Amino acid sequence: MAVVLILGGNKLIEELYALNIWPTDPHSEFSQRRFREAVEVFGRLMEHDWFQELLRKEKVRILEICAGAGIGGVALAKVLMERGVDVELLLTDIRENDLELGSRWGSEVLGRKVDYVRMDSRRVHELGCRFDIALMYGFSSPHFDPWDMVRLQASVSECLADDGILIMDEGDRRYSIFYQTGYARILPERIDNERALLSLHAGYNFKRGTFKRAYLDLKNPSKTVITEVYFWGLAELMAMVWIFFQDVDFYELRRGAGLILGYKPRRKIRIGDLQTQPRVLLSQP
């Protein structure tokens, strides 16, 4: 598949990741450790009965959304290939640099071409393909408020096969941030010899439920990125998945974190039903 640019990417997200708060180079020690952990996790996940039927297929098509450099997608493909399954992997994200890195690295690891498409994850239905698995790996849900998440789920469910599976790698941020730790108005994000990155509370959007955070590098204070995040709990995420999938399960990895599984898309609410913005969002917050 050719590399395609589909409009709708969030420029702020690209600017946020450009601050290098979270390492994305798949060759880095951090990413390699994540990759090994993902391979181990997906290896155990194959014991789930929903994947037993999948393992009997001759070919499995995987779509990774919010893929970055494709750590999760490549790990899942590797696990399936080691079990004798022929795999096609497509990475999607709005960050083209990371996709290019991930495509090259993933092709080396798997010994076959890994394709990518630069696009907004809420529009993956426009790919016009059907996949067996849709994967969202790496705690990406805070980039989507509830209004966006509804569209994301609708779009993903339309590009999955009738027996398709959604895998979301998630944690309960309401529990971990607001109960265990406490919401921080000022939070050191990454401090090392090259940068001193802080995030600061910058507001709250009541209509979307999002917290505004300003990200600032004290060593380069001329550029500040202000973005909005939604701190999801697991319960509401799983309930939303249930609206779009016939069954939902949770594969717990540790307390308050694990893999949300959606099985067999319902396709009762179509992405076309959600194209018009509701009136409540048309006015200023």
Predicted stretch roles:
Residues 76-123:
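Class I SAM-dependent methyltransferase SAM/SAH-binding core
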Residues 11-53:
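Class I SAM-dependent methyltransferase Rossmann-like catalytic core
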Residues 168-238:
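SAM-dependent methyltransferase
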